[in-house]
Amino acid sequence: MQTEQQRAVTRLCIQCGLFLLQHGAESALVDELSSRLGRALGMDSVESSISSNAIVLTTIKDGQCLTSTRKNHDRGINMHVVTEVQHIVILAEHHLLDYKGVEKRFSQIQPLRYPRWLVALMVGLSCACFCKLNNGGWDGAVITFFASTTAMYIRQLLAQRHLHPQINFCLTAFAATTISGLLLQLPTFSNTPTIAMAASVLLLVPGFPLINAVADMFKGHINTGLARWAIASLLTLATCVGVVMALTIWGLRGWV
């Protein structure tokens, strides 16, 4: 019976870590919460090894070890899932949930998804505000809003069809630069600063992965940090390729 319980707790601990890693948590948090959950559910110790595409976790109880491995598939950044997992771990630490209760709560976790139109609208507004704050004027803000909102919607459609992220970023950057650049060619916007073109692709800056990459490397998770840095760099490169393609094909004036 004790072995069966340890096996169940091991599955829950690695599921906890997998939830966090799949939805954008830093490696230190993945390690900490999976260990805390195991100890809260009666394990003597929990050891884990985290990489960008897998987790290996071992629980130790009365000298008996059980090890489990799970592959990691990126499911996109979603802090709602991360906070839900944190809440469940805290409940287990306060003995408000046993391992069966934790298993039930884990099965009920669903990523929070906002409507596409709302996400595209808010992204457009944020990019337009950046343009206005950087002396782009109201006319530049209007161009940025239209270009970035359309580009974000295109990005969502491509992601829904499971297009490779690098190709997705490249095509989205191409669309955003094309829309903003062609609008700047109109006589109405002849005096509009070209910062509008740069601001329209801000939605593609991989800020969260870069922050997590630096945090991982500072906290000793070098391999995971370098992997995240490489992925973010490839996304940035794909964005640059898309921008240069649009500038070259349409003969648009540059950002300066």
Curated annotation (Swiss-Prot):
GO biological process, one term: succinate transport
MF terms in GO: transmembrane transporter activity
Mutant phenotype after disruption: Deletion of yjjPB decreases succinate production in E.coli by 70% under anaerobic conditions.
Cytoplasmic face residues: 1-113, 159-168, 216-228
Induction profile: Has 2 promoters, 1 of which is repressed by H-NS. Activated by LeuO. A monocistronic operon.
Keyword Transport among UniProt keywords: yes
InterPro entries, sorted: ThrE-like_N (IPR010619), ThrE_Dicarb/AminoAcid_Exp (IPR050539)
Regions crossing the membrane: 114-135, 141-158, 169-189, 195-215, 229-249
Stretches assigned to the Periplasmic side: 136-140, 190-194, 250-256
Listed GO CC annotations: plasma membrane
Pfam families registered for this protein in UniProt: ThrE
Membrane topology designation: Multi-pass membrane protein
Protein's cellular compartments: Cell inner membrane
Alphabetically ordered keywords of this record: Cell inner membrane, Cell membrane, Membrane, Transmembrane, Transmembrane helix, Transport
Similarity comment: Belongs to the ThrE exporter (TC 2.A.79) family.
Function: Involved in succinate export with YjjB. Both proteins are required for export. Contributes to succinate production under both aerobic and anaerobic conditions.
Assembly behavior: The transporter is composed of YjjB and YjjP.
Extra facts: YjjPB constitutes a split-type ThrE family transporter.
Protein name: Probable succinate transporter subunit YjjP
Protein's organism: Escherichia coli (strain K12)
Gene: yjjP
